[in-house]
């Protein structure tokens, strides 16, 4: 018997009602922007506009910016994303209304103890973490960490020298990723790991496990489509971060803390010690001021998660830009040689005060902002420049698109460090250049990241020149991943400075 004829009329009516209800549920928010005359790509039921992300967030945002203008609407599943590019609106969201409306970032899925991390936490909890952790990123504390980081700069130089002597091209992300992990694990936990020469060290393996989180993972994608699944996953103890890595760092932090509390000797400055000091110096250990062991673990892990990609990818992009612009590379080397004659060891002050080095790094971050986007969750109904934004929506700022807008940056695809010279820097609108965000919830580790990257660049530029080779992709193409990455790994020829550079 035919299945269709076997079903009664009542069954067909019931199925039709279910389908209509499912459609209504899957499109219930999709009329929000259309009613207000805000343009944007047409959303699909349940999916919204997320299928467009297969192009790459950066590319999709550029297409929308060119097609729709200053504002447009997107939907991550049911989640409305109101996209803004006007500097005054950006200022309202990231600064003026930060504490009252746009305090938090949106949830991306079940995160377990990482809900206690400064970059994920919300409202009063986030304010408390920010107040406790801000003193650990002062210039005084960073100066104390500088010698620790410098030793990994020396290891980096030694490794590159070995590769250069072999005449082999070097995959930048592999080498600079190892440098980043070494710096972050050392300054976060006080652990000396030479991951360039010990890639299978358990600490390195667990740190890399944290870094394998993919925002296009089916688990994360399911939460985008069905936000109500997040508490279900949390209840089932399902987490987007690898459990074995989380457990490893929890036990490690507890062991390190006990060891340091038992020991009377003075420990070197690292973030773990500074967080312990914040705990121990609190007048009332049960007060809101003290950091718990779980909170210390969460901050330590997020330093790895947030710091690795920014540092290693930005350094890779920088060396690519220098290799393909030998005149700029030569000018940077001249500044470094003049500031530090005869390969003198750098200091915190010399590294942070070199003007052309700062210009080169800022221009790289303009061309290649690793995060692509800034987002803030709307925690109550609000009107923003005449547009109604309901509670539960997200406001999104497309950093990559803003950094490549020819109205603000002439010849935006060209690598021109002079944009950030003393003469030109003052004319840059701070709400159009935000590689680390801006306002109260900007990246707390920005100064640390700059120090780490400037030190690495100083060390390698003192000793090497970089050239394109047969494996170098020119022009560089970007991948479709969530964070900004090259389509193919950046591979360059490393030439010791006593060898004449032949140009690109």
From Swiss-Prot:
Coiled-coil residue spans: none
Catalytic activity: an organic molecule + reduced [NADPH--hemoprotein reductase] + O2 = an alcohol + oxidized [NADPH--hemoprotein reductase] + H2O + H(+)
Keyword S-adenosyl-L-methionine among record annotations: no
UniProt topology in membrane: Peripheral membrane protein
EC primary class: oxidoreductase
GO cellular component: endoplasmic reticulum membrane
CDD domains: CYP3A (cd20650)
Tissue specificity remark: Expressed in liver. Also expressed in the kidneys of female mice, with traces in the stomach, ovary, and heart of female mice and in the testis of male mice.
Record's keyword terms, sorted: Endoplasmic reticulum, Heme, Iron, Membrane, Metal-binding, Microsome, Monooxygenase, Oxidoreductase
Annotated GO MF terms: heme binding; iron ion binding; oxidoreductase activity, acting on paired donors, with incorporation or reduction of molecular oxygen, reduced flavin or flavoprotein as one donor, and incorporation of one atom of oxygen
Cofactor entry: heme
Disulphide connectivity of cysteines: none
Compartments it resides in: Endoplasmic reticulum membrane; Microsome membrane
Residues noted as binding heme in the record, renumbered to the chain: 443
Keyword Heme: yes
UniProt-listed Enzyme Commission number(s): 1.14.14.1
GO biological process: regulation of gene expression; response to bacterium
PROSITE patterns per UniProt: CYTOCHROME_P450 (PS00086)
UniProt record similarity statement: Belongs to the cytochrome P450 family.
Protein name: Cytochrome P450 3A41
Phylogenetic lineage: Eukaryota, Metazoa, Chordata, Craniata, Vertebrata
């Amino acid at each position: 018997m035919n299945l269709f004829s076997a079903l009664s009329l009542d069954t067909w009516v019931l199925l039709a009602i279910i389908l209509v209800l499912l459609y209504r549920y899957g499109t219930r928010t999709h009329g929000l922007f259309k009613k207000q005359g805000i343009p944007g790509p047409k959303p699909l039921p349940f999916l919204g506009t997320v299928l467009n992300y297969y192009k790459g967030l950066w590319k999709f945002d550029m297409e929308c910016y060119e097609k729709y203008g200053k504002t447009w609407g997107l939907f991550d599943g049911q989640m409305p994303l109101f996209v803004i590019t006007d500097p005054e609106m950006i200022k309202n969201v990231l600064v003026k209304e930060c504490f009252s409306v746009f305090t938090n970032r949106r949830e991306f899925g079940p995160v377990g103890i990482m809900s206690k991390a400064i970059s994920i936490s919300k409202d009063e909890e986030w304010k408390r973490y920010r107040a406790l952790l801000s003193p650990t990123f002062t210039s005084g504390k960073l100066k104390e960490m500088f010698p620790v980081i410098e030793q990994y700069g020396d290891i980096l130089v030694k490794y590159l020298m070995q590769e250069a002597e072999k005449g082999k091209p070097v995959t930048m992300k592999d080498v600079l990723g190892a440098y980043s992990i070494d710096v972050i694990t050392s300054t976060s936990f006080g652990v000396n790991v030479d991951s360039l020469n010990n890639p299978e060290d358990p600490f390195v393996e667990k740190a890399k496990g944290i870094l394998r989180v993919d925002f296009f993972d089916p688990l994360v994608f399911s939460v985008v489509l069905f936000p109500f699944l997040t508490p279900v996953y949390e209840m089932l103890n399902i987490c987007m971060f690898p459990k074995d890595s989380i457990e490893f760092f929890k036990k490690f932090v507890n062991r390190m803390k006990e060891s340091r509390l038992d020991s009377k000797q003075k420990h070197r400055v690292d973030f773990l010690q500074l967080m312990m000091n914040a705990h121990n110096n609190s007048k009332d250990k049960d007060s809101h001021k003290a950091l718990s062991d779980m909170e210390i673990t969460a901050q330590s892990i997020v330093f790895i998660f947030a710091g690795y990609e920014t540092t290693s990818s930005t350094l890779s992009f920088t060396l690519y830009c220098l290799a393909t612009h030998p005149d700029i590379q030569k000018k940077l080397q001249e500044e470094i040689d003049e500031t530090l004659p005869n390969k003198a060891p750098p200091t915190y002050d010399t590294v942070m005060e070199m003007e052309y080095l700062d210009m080169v790094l800022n221009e790289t971050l303009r061309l290649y902002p690793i995060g692509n986007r800034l987002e803030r969750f709307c925690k109550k109904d609000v009107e923003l420049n005449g547009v109604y934004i309901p509670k539960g929506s997200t406001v999104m700022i497309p950093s990559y698109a803003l950094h490549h807008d020819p109205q603000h940056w002439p010849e935006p695809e060209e690598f021109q460090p002079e944009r950030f010279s003393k003469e030109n820097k003052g004319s840059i609108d701070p709400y159009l250049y935000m590689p680390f965000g801006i306002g109260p919830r900007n990246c707390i580790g920005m100064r640390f990241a700059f120090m780490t990257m400037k030190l690495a660049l100083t060390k390698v530029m003192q000793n090497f020149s970089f050239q394109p080779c047969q494996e170098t992709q020119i022009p560089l193409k970007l991948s479709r991943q969530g964070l900004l990455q090259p389509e193919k790994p950046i591979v360059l020829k490393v030439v010791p400075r006593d060898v004449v550079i032949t140009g690109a």
